[in-house]
Amino acid sequence: MRSLVVCLLLAACALECTARLQNVTVKGVAVCNKKRLANVEVQLYEKDTLDPDDLLDTKKTDAEGEFSVYGEEDETHAIAPYLLITHSCNPSKPNCVRIGRYLVPEDKIGGTYDMTYVTLDIKVHGEKEKCQ
């Protein structure tokens, strides 16, 4: 039993030693019906397989609808970042918000992903709606 614990500790240390710090910046402009949208929540997450996804950064769009989020994570494999954008552009019912998920391309890791205009009036695959 003791040797099993030692082996597990050594394996955990080996994984930690091979982890490397990776980062990404994502920027863009939130628009709804061709108008820039202020005060939209933009969250940058990093997908994990075995444990809950890591929230790396949260920002609100400014008065011009612009946002920029940055995150970094130590991982043994390539990070899998994505954005959750929560907004009230064309919900199906009053008092509801839409939550869209946007994947960050793998080739943008270590740099900046400029989404330019994020058209929130167009529904994205897997989008959710939350009503109060």
UniProtKB/Swiss-Prot annotation:
Location (main, coarse): secreted
The keyword Signal is assigned to this record: yes
Signal sequence, start to end: 1-19
Cited InterPro entries: Transthyretin-like, Transthyretin-like_sf
Residue positions with a glycan: N23
Subcellular localization: Secreted
Disulfide cross-links: none
A Pfam family hit: TTR-52
Source domain of life: Eukaryota
GO terms for cellular component: cell surface; extracellular region
UniProtKB keywords: Glycoprotein, Secreted, Signal
PANTHER family per the UniProt record, alphabetical: TRANSTHYRETIN-LIKE FAMILY PROTEIN-RELATED, TRANSTHYRETIN-LIKE PROTEIN 16
Name the UniProt record assigns to this protein: Transthyretin-like protein 16
Organism field: Caenorhabditis elegans
Source taxonomy: Eukaryota, Metazoa, Ecdysozoa, Nematoda, Chromadorea
